[in-house]
C-alpha cells in the first residue's frame, strides 16, 4: 500500500488538470502500433486525431466507459497500479488520454474478454500506454479518473450529410470534452433540437442548406455555449468551421 500512496502523491503534485471524479480501478492494454497510427479513425468519428486536436494520447473505451458514444472526447488521467503489478508498471508516471474509440467485447473469449460489458478498460495507443506500463506486460491494472480536457484553439464543427439531413461532428472540445445536448438554428428557422447519431456526430432532419447556422451546445459538465452564426450562408457539405469559443467545464 505504501508504494501506491507515494505514487499517488507524486502524481497529484505533478498534475495540473483538476479532477472531475475520484480514483477508480480498471485495466489497460494497448493497440495501434508503436507509432499509434492504427488508432486513427474510430467509433467517435474523429478521423485523423492529429487534425482534430487529440493527438496520439488516446484510448478506445470499453462498454461502460464508452456509454454509447456519450463519452467521446472525455479526458482521463491514468496511472499504473504499481502495488498490484510492480513488474509491469512504471512507477511515478501518469498519462492523460482522450476517449476516441470503442473497444467492443470479444465474445470468442470468456466473459467477452478485457473489453467486456461490465469492465472499465482502456485500450490505449501504444505510445500513451508505454508511459505507464512495461511493453512485455501487455495488460496492467490501473487507477483512473476523469479530468478537465485542455485544447488548443476553439471548438470546431464539420458538416456532412445530404439535402434534408445534416450530420455535425463536434471536435476539439475542452472542459468535460463531451456533449450532453445540442441544437441548431438556421437564419430562417428557430432552434431545432439535435440528436446523437453516432460517436460525436449529431444529426438534424431539416432543410438548412443556404442558411447561416448557429449552434447551442451543452457539455456533460453542464456548461452551455451559443455559437452564433458560426457557419456562413454559403456553406457546403464537408466543410469544417472553427470558432474562438471554448468550454471550461
UniProtKB/Swiss-Prot annotation:
InterPro entries: Expan_Lol_pI, Expansin, Expansin/allergen_DPBB_dom, Expansin_CBD, Expansin_CBD_sf, RlpA-like_DPBB, RlpA-like_sf. The keyword Cell wall biogenesis/degradation applies. Transmembrane segments: none annotated. GO terms for biological process: plant-type cell wall loosening. Residues 1-21 form the signal peptide. The keyword Cell wall biogenesis/degradation applies. PROSITE patterns: EXPANSIN_CBD, EXPANSIN_EG45. Keywords: Cell wall, Cell wall biogenesis/degradation, Glycoprotein, Membrane, Secreted, Signal. Its main location: secreted. It is found in: Secreted, Cell wall; Membrane. Residues 41-154 form the Expansin-like EG45 domain. Expressed in roots. GO terms for cellular component: extracellular region; membrane. It is a peripheral membrane protein. Glycans are attached at residue 116. It comes from the Eukaryota. Belongs to the expansin family. Expansin A subfamily. May cause loosening and extension of plant cell walls by disrupting non-covalent bonding between cellulose microfibrils and matrix glucans. No enzymatic activity has been found. May be required for rapid internodal elongation in deepwater rice during submergence. This is Expansin-A18. The lineage of its organism: Eukaryota, Viridiplantae, Streptophyta, Embryophyta, Tracheophyta.
